[in-house]
Amino acid sequence: MQNVINTVKGKALEVAEYLTPVLKESKFKETGVITPEEFVAAGDHLVHHCPTWQWATGEELKVKAYLPTDKQFLVTKNVPCYKRCKQMEYSDELEAIIEEDDGDGGWVDTYHNTGITGITEAVKEITLESKDSIKLQDCSALCDEEDEEDEGEAADMEEYEESGLLETDEATLDTRKIVEACKAKADAGGEDAILQTRTYDLYITYDKYYQTPRLWLFGYDEQRQPLTVEHMYEDISQDHVKKTVTIENHPHLPPPPMCSVHPCRHAEVMKKIIETVAEGGGELGVHMYLLIFLKFVQAVIPTIEYDYTRHFTM
């Protein structure tokens, strides 16, 4: 039944997006939405600092006139996913409800303190200097230094909206132990080793109706064979499956359909982050949008290790 409802909603939103005029005037600071031009600027910034992300065009017939032909959407491929969400030990302490007083019952962040369970996310820190412009340290160094550095726990909605938003995470874990454990299982030929070798292709598009970025993902098994929808749902927080995350057609690519993180809350979350930075005497530039965006969607896909940006500190 939920799939039918999502399908109807998806078709209605396609019509609504078609009829929605392109946003021309910046409303980033006021509402958290962005124009297509701002999306491109934020995408250029992401590509510059995280070269694993690249611009793409997609199908020629699906090119959007309000975006440059060669910058229709962003893509990063072969992103590792070593664990299923159900393999993350559940505890009431790990669950937080974001915006519980809204009409939809709030956004449930099931893994907002994943460091407790020993799950390490490959995330570095973004430095947000108080009363100064934002400085981003190049995250591409991860490719050369990931074996030498400790990596902080995953960022999430709870940190941004309810716990000071931009505080430094103290907990760090040695990821080499996790890698060694995975290798040991692989050498033993255990079934668990197969489950821990999935990869995902991730895409970021511009949603003209919601006027925000939108994340899409499609997964593959260890043989690079496409995962079924049910298997991809295993890598998504179960509180978001068929709610925040639905199966829809990519706006720039041919079928099969992909998992998509619904963008209806993105502008609201971004607006709160902007306000928090301003309260600390700083200013959040629109070029940082996608780097922050990739942070708060980790609550939805906590085991997909795509986010190589840095945490925020005030």
UniProtKB/Swiss-Prot annotation:
Disruption phenotype: Homozygous mice lacking the Atg3 gene are at Mendelian frequency, their body weightis lower than expected and they die within 1 d after birth. Its EC number is 2.3.2.-. Changing residue 11 to L: Does not affect GABARAPL1 lipdation. Rescues MAP1LC3B lipidation when transfected in cell lacking ATG3. Induction: ATG3 protein translation is increased by EIF5A. Changing residue 11 to R: Rescues MAP1LC3B lipidation when transfected in cell lacking ATG3. Changing residue 243 to R: Abolishes ATG12 conjugation, leading to an expansion in mitochondrial mass and fragmented mitochondrial morphology. Does not affect PE-conjugation to ATG8-like proteins. Reduces autophagosome maturation. The membrane-curvature-sensing motif targets curved membranes. The N-terminal region works in concert with its geometry-selective amphipathic helix (AH) to promote LC3-PE conjugation activity only on the target membrane. E2 conjugating enzyme that catalyzes the covalent conjugation of the C-terminal Gly of ATG8-like proteins (GABARAP, GABARAPL1, GABARAPL2 or MAP1LC3A) to the amino group of phosphatidylethanolamine (PE)-containing lipids in the membrane resulting in membrane-bound ATG8-like proteins which is one of the key steps in the development of autophagic isolation membranes during autophagosome formation. Cycles back and forth between binding to ATG7 for loading with the ATG8-like proteins and binding to E3 enzyme, composed of ATG12, ATG5 and ATG16L1 to promote ATG8-like proteins lipidation. This is Ubiquitin-like-conjugating enzyme ATG3. It comes from Mus musculus (Mouse). The gene is Atg3.
